Amino acid sequence: MVWIFSIFVKLLLVNGYRSTDFEVHRNWLSITYRLPIKEWYYDTTNIWTLDYPPLFAYFEYFLSHITPNFVIKDGCLDLMSEKISSQVYGETTVMWQRFTVILSEFILYLSLRSFSLLSNTNFLVCSSIILNPGFFILDHIHFQYNGFLFGLFISSIIAVKQEKYLKSALMFSISLCFKHIYLYLAPCYFVFLLRAYCLNFDNFEFKTYVSLIQIIQWKNLFKLAAVVLSTFIITFAPFIYIGYTLQDYQQILSRLFPFSRGLTHAYWAPNFWSIYSTIDKILTMLVKYLNKLKYIGSLRKIIDIPQLIAQIQLNETANNGSKGLVSDVTFNILPQIPPKITFALTLFYQLLALLPLFFNCNFKRFIGSLTLCGYGSYLFGWHVHEKAIMLVIIPFTFLVILDKRLLTPYMLLTSSGIVSLFPLLYTSQDFLIKIIYSLLWMIVYFVSINEVSEKNYVGQDRRVWFFDRLAMIYIVCLLPIVLISGVLDIFQFGNGKYEFLSLMLYSCYCSVGVFTSWIGLSWLYNFDEPLWV
């Protein structure tokens, strides 16, 4: 019934706003339909080039070949420049592509159905995922296929719960071959499957180095390796068959990992780098203000203001992060951040989540580690999209029902994460829809999860700490932030000079919620051992 209700709501949204992601997927349909496979990752007819792994390309190929003739005649599969593409197709194409998103989301329903029937608690988790505002915003208004992809990913999580480790490895490998963003979560799967399925420390006693070899369950290790490797080999089999060379595979990698896109996205995802960028903006404004003062002689001994002003003027034509451009970002005051710094930070914080998992390998630890790996990649990764917050929200949903202490970080994450998606829907007709639906979802599921987690809490009596009250104040203040941002968008203060101000407000305020929730979960994960037994 929940899924049927969700379909009804989605059908009401088919005529709503759609983003350029609609053009992206329409162009991918055209590429896979009109061109031979060897040209898929080389075509530049349209700026919306194919930049997803091969399995998703095959998915687009499948959709293009089941497209009805009347939709093809509408221009759905015409390969053309982005300058004229929107003038060629009509509403028939829009309806068809909307329908494919709704239909593909059946995978999400299938992955959750059997799990939801096991208990009322599981049903609560599954229904909250199916009705999550993030999927409604990203897939059924903005336009993407996240529900379908997360259905595959969730299947791997549920397989871990059922101790079907080979199935989990298979489903995660398939997910990775559909969308490479799941690569951020691969370390958690690697450590867990290695420890739970391939290593046996029962009655282990180190005598010689032979003892270390004996803890390896070689049969399981080979089976696991066979499942993972065969998935990737089958995925790339068509490219192998047509004789792709090393240079051709490098072309695919360059499409999947375009480092030239810069540290931050056009709209800053609410992570550490949005705070970093904001501080750089504030320092830039401060330096400009100090430069106008007459009495700054003493300051010149500490700060070389003329040199900073010269640097700021030099960067005026560059992408300073607030121009809505997708390219390398240049900071005026703070040090520049290369990709290796983001990778090092991501790896460091993921390692902190992986070590406890290796020594205490169970489902609770796995979900906790998976969530923290998602946090690490989202907060410190390179060119993170705001949509990637779902990589953290979905695993955390399986975790929060296990204990009351996890509720506050979860509410902080989901509320700030969902609100951070609001700028994707900037038209007036979507303003009330996104607010009312998200607000209703938060009220219903925050209250329900609170009741369930209270029953599952087996520790000592829990006090309501100041942090919890502060978190509630933060969540309530999200609504004024949304309204203020709406006013800024309407009036465009400063004749458009501060057009990025509302996005900066969203990004900075939501980053506080995401960052605080990460700290809260990290503390519980590393220092509250009874919670993970």
Language model feature labels by segment:
Residues 109, 113, 117, 153-162, ...:
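Hydrophobic transmembrane alpha-helices
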Residues 60, 97-108, 112:
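Hydrophobic alpha-helical transmembrane segments in multi-pass integral membrane proteins
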Residues 2-68, 154-161, 165-171, 204-213:
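General structural concept
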Residues 1-10, 105, 126, 475-482, ...:
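Alpha-helical transmembrane segments
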Residues 22-27, 31-70, 77-98, 133-149, ...:
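Membrane-interfacial catalytic/cofactor-binding modules of polytopic membrane enzymes
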